[in-house]
Every structure is written in structure tokens, then in C-alpha cells.
Amino acid sequence: MDDHKRPLYLPFAGPAILEAPLINKGSAFTDEERVFFNLEGLLPHVIETIEEQASRAYDQYTNFTNDLDRHIYLRNIQDTNETLYYRLVQNHITEMMPIIYTPTVGMACERFSKNYRRNRGLFISYPHKDRIEDILNNSTRQKVKIIVVTDGERILGLGDQGIGGMGIPIGKLSLYTSCGGISPAYTLPITLDVGTDNPHLLEDPMYMGWRNQRIGGEEYKEFVEAFMQAVNRRWPDALIQFEDFAQKNAMPLLERYKDQYCCFNDDIQGTAAVTVGSLLAACKAAKSQLCEQRIAFLGAGSAGCGIAEAIVAQMVSEGIDEAQARSQVFMVDRWGLLQDNMPNLLNFQEKLAQKTQAVKDWTIENGNISLLDVMNNAKPTVLIGVSGAPGLFSEEIIKAMHQHCPRPIVFPLSNPTSRVEATPKDVLHWTNGQALVATGSPFEPVALNGETFEIAQCNNSYIFPGIGLGVLSAGAKRVSDEMLMASSRALAECSPLALNGEGPLLPPLEEIHQVSKHIAFAVAKVAVEQGHALPCTDELLAQSIENNFWTAEYRRYKRTSF
């Protein structure tokens, strides 16, 4: 019997049920349930279906005049009736995705303390480092299977938001459920409150976090280590997603824990997976391979380098050697093109630095090799922006790229919208509609020369929900690079442009459930093949994915004793 058809036995009654968002039905409680659970008189007379409730909620939603108020309204529904929240979001996924996550979630993080209403998730503060296990046991969620954790230091492109960063784990887990069918009862957002270096927060009397400079060094490492060990003891089968950690911590934490626990970093690996999937779709539509492309990056931090390494791995899988693949990738940061003779390269940048000998004959304007110099000399066919700095894909740069590449692939991926390297409208105008554009944040379609261009949102929400569903369904103990590569290829297989030669690069969000299931199967299959999960047939994996896919429907309740 499907979970939503199986009755749920509850040992409590009265107002306590109405205050529990996972089980509250509001006006949808039946006459029988109202009697059995002492709810008579606590609700209006009319008994509604979930669709009737969702219709009223949407009517209220449309009365708000700005996106932040809409976000707050939806969060209020989530904190009172989660099933209704997810039905509403699923009914209007394209419209509401930018409200519950990027770009609106950025504003919500900045105003988190000012707008705080109800508790959700766990805040683990450094002064409580000796009580982490107790805090985990205080969680209202007992069967946690997916955790998203942040320390709030690098929230989107907004920097240090302290505990305000909690908006990101909450939003990400909302997408695990609305896109990937993960039951909200299995999800837990966590913020590691290690202080903040944001002076505005430290001076803000409303700031609700630990009012202290951020800890670092060994103190920080020991705190995170204590957290990881405590989580593993409490929920040994949970998938842990690292989210919005600063560059100095993101890659070291991933390298330290990826072979110890079932974990991944969405900023590094999820962004890489969705970008590679989008590039594979673009290449397939052009009847070419990724290994034939020359790729320039603006932004050489952990996210950019993570994407580049995933691209190199895919190129190698297509038949070229690693050295050749790396020679076709050009990483540009604030100091110019990364070269192997540069001092102070970070560990994860070293393998992606160009050989100085290979660029010694380039014609350059100044001492450092700029992005424009890369355009004029390397003649890239793909341009990816992960700089977090707006407007850096200038008209001059895009036109220089278009001069040597008739159909340039341009991905300005920085979030939120205010940080994007170039708008799709500008890129399409500068290339007379010839560029293939995907962005990190949502943009409206662009009208040009009598055509309407749908802008693909190269958003991690296409990838991480499917990864989570696949890991959960297979019972995987690790998230391997091969599992992530499988997710990229599975996403590319869903591309309307690649499949039909027309349409958007990525499937519409209305199809996200099918996409997530397709990705989940690919991920789960590789997990089994690599021994990260118990042996299982394809048929049983597919059935497990269906069984684990939660839908926003009310269950029947029956009374039981404690």
C-alpha cells in the first residue's frame, strides 16, 4: 500500500495536532477525525479538499505586491501545514521556484533575524560545542535522511550572513521535496553558528546569532569534526549536503569527509553536475562532443574549479587524454588567467593553471592575461561565469567571442540575479540571437528579431533532488564522482533541445518530477555498480524510487495510545 493511502496513527489530540506542521490538515480534517482528535470547534465548519485549500492560499499569495512578502507568506504556510505548502508549490512550481529559492531567498537571508517568526531546523552554536549530541536529539524530526548544513559564511553572492544563512538549507530542502519527492519528515536544515565577520550583523541589536567574530583554524576544524561524528552517530544513514561554505573551507571539508561519510558539496559538485549536464545537452544539439570545446571561466574559486574538473573528467571519458583536456580549459580570476608560474595558487587551482609556455606567444594588452585576451587568443567556444560580480561579460567580450564562434555557449551562472555577469537579453542582442544562454537565476524569455528565446535556468535544483532521491532509494553509503557524472548525463538525456533539435536547453520545471526520477535511477545504478549500495536489480531500483517518492496528499489519521 502507498504511504499516502496507509493510515497514520497519532498518540495525541487537540491543538497539538494543529501546531504540528507535518501532520496538520487545517480545514481538511474530516468529521470523523475532528471527533476522534478533539478538534470540534477548533476549526470552521466546512471541510475542504487540499485543492480547495491550495486555491485559497494561491489567491492570498497573489495579493502580495513584492517577492519578499510572498516568500514570507509561503514560509508561514510551510511552518503550519507542510503538505499544503508542497501542494501549492507543486501546482505553481515555475512561478514559485524563484520565490522559495533564488533569487528571493537571498533577501530572506539578509533579513532573517528581522523577519524571524518560528523555529525550523537546528542552530548549533560554537559555545555549545560540547552539547552537539544533545542538540541533535532535540530535533523534531526523528527519521532524518537528508541534512543540508551551512555555516553562513558565503551565502549566494552576498557573503557572510551569519545565522541568516539558515534560509539556504531551508530553501534547498524545500526543493528536495518539491522537485525530488523526498518526504519533508526526512529532512533537516542545520546552521553551524561559528560567529560572523559581518560588522552590520555584529552591530545589529536584532541579530539572533552568536555575537562574536568567526572562529577559524583548529577550533573550526574540531567543531565541524565533532558535528560530523555526532550526526553519524545519530543518523548513520543520512546524506549530508554542505552548502555555502567559504572557499577556504568548502574544498578542504569536502576532501576530508567525502570518503568517510555520505556527503557532497552542492556549490562545488552540484553546480558542476548541472553545468556539465547542460553543456552535454548543448553539444548534443550541435552534434558535437564536449571534448571538442574550448572553455573559458570567469571565476576560479571552488565552484568554478569544481565545474572545470568535472568538465575535464567528462572530456577524458569521451576519449582525449587528461593533459589535452586541461589545455582546453582557461580559468580567469581577478588576477587574470591562471598560469603555472603564479605564486599563491590554491591547491585546487594548480592542475587547472595553463602552462606559461603555452601562452607565451599570445598577444596581450597589459601584464596580466585578461578575459578579453583569452577571447582573442584561445578563441573559446564556451564561456562560464561564476565570479559573483555583475556585468563582467561586457559587450566587447561577448562580441569578441562571437567573432570566432558562430554559436557561442554563454553561461552567466552567478546568483542572485543582481550578481549575474550579463543578462540573457544583452548576450542575445550582442550575438544577434546566435548565443545559447543558460543562467543560474531565473530570467524572463527574450524577444528578438521576431523570435522568443526561452532562457534555461542552469540551476542545481535540476540535479541535487535527483541525487538525494537516488542515494535514499539505493541506500548508498557514499556519493562518488561517478554517481555525479551519471547525474549530468541523465540530465542531458532530458533536454528538449538535444532530443528534438528545438525548444529549451533544459526541460521545463513542470517536468521536474520525471527528471528527478530519471537522475535518481542513474545515480542509484552507479552506486550499486560501485559497491556503495547493496546489490539490486534495475527493476527493484526503479520500484524503490517510486516507493520513496513522496506526494503532497493528506493521509488518514487514526487514534492510538502512547
From Swiss-Prot:
Please list the GO biological process terms of this entry: malate metabolic process
Answer whether the UniProt record assigns the keyword NADP to this protein: no
Q: Known PROSITE patterns for this protein?
A: MALIC_ENZYMES
Q: Which GO terms describe its cellular component?
A: cytosol
Which reactions fall under this protein's catalytic activity? (S)-malate + NAD(+) = pyruvate + CO2 + NADH; oxaloacetate + H(+) = pyruvate + CO2
Residues forming the catalytic site: Y101 (proton donor), K172 (proton acceptor)
Annotated Gene Ontology MF terms? malate dehydrogenase (decarboxylating) (NAD+) activity; metal ion binding; NAD binding; oxaloacetate decarboxylase activity
Which cysteines are cross-linked by disulfides?
Answer: none
The EC number on file is 1.1.1.38
A Pfam family that this protein carries is: Malic_M
Q: How is the cofactor bound?
A: Divalent metal cations. Prefers magnesium or manganese.
Site annotation (Important for activity): which residues?
A: D267
**Which residues are listed for NAD(+) binding in this entry?**
R154, D267, N415
Q: Which cofactor does it need?
A: Mg(2+); Mn(2+)
Coiled coil ranges? none
The UniProt entry, under HAMAP family, shows: NAD_malic_enz
Q: Do you know which NCBIfam families this protein is assigned to?
A: PRK13529.1 (NF010052)
Q: How does it assemble?
A: Homotetramer.
Per the similarity annotation, which family is this?
A: Belongs to the malic enzymes family.
In Swiss-Prot or TrEMBL terms, this protein is called: NAD-dependent malic enzyme
What is the scientific name of the source organism? Shewanella woodyi (strain ATCC 51908 / MS32)
Source taxonomy? Bacteria, Pseudomonadati, Pseudomonadota, Gammaproteobacteria, Alteromonadales
